[in-house]
A protein has these predicted regions:
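Terminal alpha-helical anchor/extension segments at protein ends
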Residues: 1-264
């Protein structure tokens, strides 16, 4: 629910920025190109007649220079937009979505620094001057949901590959034990599962079994261990994959890919 998305919708002259969340989107300050060639089109009549020093300009040379200047202005503008996006991403955004008409969105992605590309989840075909915050919110969150599902399915595949070599654990109690030891790199959670349990009093670890908390202080009942396991994993800077549908049936409610191999 706390997911924040920075959405950038750009053309060659301007860019609009939106702060997007699950329940809405707010428009932020935009970026405008300071030196756009607002004449718009090349007029060949501007290039007729002799050039300085005698002779005539080569046919089409004026139009070539004009188009080249347009391309250079566009590249400088997109670089400024990308720089602004990168600075704003430091303000706690989880993901980045870009939009534009035609190839503009892909052109903007090319200017992003590699350090922020892992937060880029997709590009949208949008008219920068017409798009509304409501449309941005719906389209951006659809991209985020698709990205999350693809990432979760990839995590399940990696889990299945690593399980035989003890680089992963399956099942609630085994996974909670790995989490208590700080072993979890990626936590896999079945979206539709609910597991009541306990948080042991002195150790603070989670367990499905009251008996397993014996000797660790007064246990605290937990309505759903999976929610608390997600919070513990995030505090340990582990990745969390909430898995929906058929892929969730490939593990037992809770599983983990480990930071280091389990001992025999």
């Amino acid at each position: 629910e706390g997911t924040r998305v920075l959405a950038v919708v750009a053309d060659r002259r301007s860019a609009r920025f939106f702060d997007v969340g699950l329940f809405g989107a707010a428009e932020l300050d935009g970026v405008a190109a300071p030196e756009s060639s607002r004449g718009g089109r090349f007029h060949s009549a501007q290039r007729t007649g002799p050039r300085q020093g005698g002779g005539h300009a080569a046919p089409g040379s004026g139009e070539y220079r004009f188009q080249n200047r347009i391309r250079e202005e566009k590249e400088r503008h997109l670089a400024r937009v990308a720089e602004s996006a990168q600075a704003r991403l430091r303000s706690g955004y989880d993901f980045l979505v870009v939009g534009g008409i035609g190839v503009e969105a892909d052109a903007l992605v090319a200017h992003l620094h590699p350090s922020v590309r892992d937060r880029f989840v997709g590009a949208l075909q949008l008219a920068p001057k017409k798009v509304t915050p409501a449309e941005i919110q719906v389209r951006a969150m659809e991209l985020v949901a698709d990205h999350a599902q693809r990432s979760a399915e990839a995590a399940v595949e990696e889990f299945r590959e690593r399980l035989p070599a003890r680089w992963a654990v399956d099942g609630v109690e085994s996974t909670l034990g790995a989490l208590a030891r700080g072993q979890v790199r990626t936590l896999l959670v079945d979206h539709d599962a609910r597991v009541p349990g306990y948080r042991c009093g002195t150790s603070g670890r989670l367990s499905e079994s009251l008996a397993l908390c014996r000797g660790e202080g007064e246990p605290m009942p937990i309505a759903d261990l999976l929610d608390d396991a997600i919070e513990d994993a995030l505090r340990q800077r582990a990745n969390v994959a909430v898995v929906r549908g058929a892929p969730a049936r490939r593990f037992d409610r809770l599983a983990a890919i480990l930071r280091f191999q389990m001992a025999r």
